[in-house]
């Protein structure tokens, strides 16, 4: 039998622990801080380390600059869609789901709801 045990979650960055994985700011830490948002309370996803390192914002300054520009211009829906599209375009490191959007579906939904509240678009 192939058993898989995951403990994914979403919450404010300082409120969730990595639990053997990593915490991924749904909107990158740099883009948030450059635009005056708290990175400690910004919603993040607890995810597998390999998945985190495969996200668009991980170590990719061009991606982060695009995020920051969208935030600066208050293009919040476009920013959130960019994050969802990135998850959809990335493969699951475990090969169980087709992509990260499916693997972290509930966590993405949680982040979207919280970021819509934060940005005043809920």
Q: Language-model features: where?
A:
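Catalytic toxin/effector domains delivered as secreted proteins or via bacterial secretion systems
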Residues: 1-122
């Amino acid at each position: 039998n192939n058993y898989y045990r995951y403990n994914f979650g979403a919450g404010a960055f300082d409120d969730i622990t990595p639990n053997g994985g990593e915490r991924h700011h749904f909107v990158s830490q740099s883009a948030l801080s450059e635009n005056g948002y708290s990175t400690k309370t910004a919603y993040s996803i607890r995810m597998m380390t390999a998945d985190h390192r495969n996200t668009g914002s991980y170590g990719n300054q061009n991606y982060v600059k695009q995020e920051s520009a969208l935030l600066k211009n208050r293009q919040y829906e476009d920013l959130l869609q960019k994050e969802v599209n990135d998850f959809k375009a990335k493969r699951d490191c475990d090969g169980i789901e087709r992509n990260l959007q499916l693997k972290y579906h509930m966590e993405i939904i949680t982040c979207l709801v919280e970021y819509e509240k934060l940005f005043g678009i809920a």
